[in-house]
């Protein structure tokens, strides 16, 4: 713990806490201040001036990052018949029906994405208490309730991320790994920012993005100048 604290202090010394960095500077600093001994995840966090209690100010969706996330998602698909075969052919890791529901209810959660055909949602709905809090419940807004299961599986395997504003109006998302070239991280960052900017509710008032930070696993938060994106 003492060693970790020392490493964090050393990382913080490289950051000017009063400054909001350009995206290029912030990405470079995130890589430089990372002290994890593994390929750390790089994340961004947007603090948005929205009221998520209002239906028209809820922000949720999905996108495929230009350079992926650096992680191959484990994809589970609820489908039957031809659609089940389509999911398997597209590379889904797990495909099933009631058997998967029983397995998940028994505590199995070794997957990252859940996709379902519309006709399976009555069955999947039984897992709401398990999947909902983990942000794994299939949803049409994120493209995970669909008849085009092949496309959904391929996108999930190819770097698709989902995002959702929490109760405080904060949206967090993975934009890659520390091992990524700085240019690729910056491009992923800019692509995600474009999506967030386009998602601004028409009824939102005042400054939309009140703060923006980038960080790595275990690393310090670095303020980003949203105007640089």
From Swiss-Prot:
Family named by the database record: Belongs to the universal ribosomal protein uL1 family.
Entry keyword annotation includes Phosphoprotein: no
HAMAP family in the record: Ribosomal_uL1_B (MF_01318_B)
Short name of any one Pfam family annotated for the protein: Ribosomal_L1
Key word rRNA-binding present: yes
Official protein name in the record: Large ribosomal subunit protein uL1
Gene Ontology molecular functions: rRNA binding; structural constituent of ribosome; tRNA binding
Stored SUPFAM superfamilies: Ribosomal protein L1
Superkingdom of this protein's organism: Bacteria
Description of how the protein assembles with itself and partners: Part of the 50S ribosomal subunit.
A GO CC term assigned to this protein in UniProt: large ribosomal subunit
Biological role: Binds directly to 23S rRNA. The L1 stalk is quite mobile in the ribosome, and is involved in E site tRNA release. Protein L1 is also a translational repressor protein, it controls the translation of the L11 operon by binding to its mRNA.
Keywords: Repressor, Ribonucleoprotein, Ribosomal protein, RNA-binding, rRNA-binding, Translation regulation, tRNA-binding
GO terms (BP aspect): regulation of translation; translation
């Amino acid at each position: 713990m003492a060693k970790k604290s020392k490493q964090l202090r050393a990382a913080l010394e490289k950051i000017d806490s009063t400054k909001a960095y350009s995206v290029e500077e912030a990405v470079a600093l995130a890589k430089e201040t990372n002290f994890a001994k593994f390929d750390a995840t790089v994340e961004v966090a947007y603090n948005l001036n929205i009221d998520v209690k209002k239906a028209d100010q809820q922000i949720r969706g999905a996108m495929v990052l230009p350079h992926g996330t650096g992680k191959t998602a484990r994809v589970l698909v609820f489908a039957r018949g031809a659609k089940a075969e389509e999911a398997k052919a597209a590379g889904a890791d797990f495909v099933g029906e009631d058997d998967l529901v029983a397995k998940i209810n028994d505590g199995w959660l070794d997957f990252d994405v859940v996709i379902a055909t519309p006709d399976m949602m009555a069955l999947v709905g039984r897992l709401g208490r398990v999947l909902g809090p983990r942000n794994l419940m299939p949803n049409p807004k994120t493209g995970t309730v669909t008849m085009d299961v092949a496309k959904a599986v391929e996108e999930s395997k190819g770097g698709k991320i989902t995002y959702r504003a929490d109760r405080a109006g904060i949206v967090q998302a993975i934009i890659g790994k520390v091992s990524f070239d700085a240019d690729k991280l910056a491009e992923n960052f800019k692509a995600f920012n474009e999506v967030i900017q386009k998602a601004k509710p028409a009824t939102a008032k005042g400054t939309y993005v009140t703060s923006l930070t980038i960080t790595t696993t275990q690393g310090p938060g670095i303020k980003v100048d949203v105007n640089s994106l």
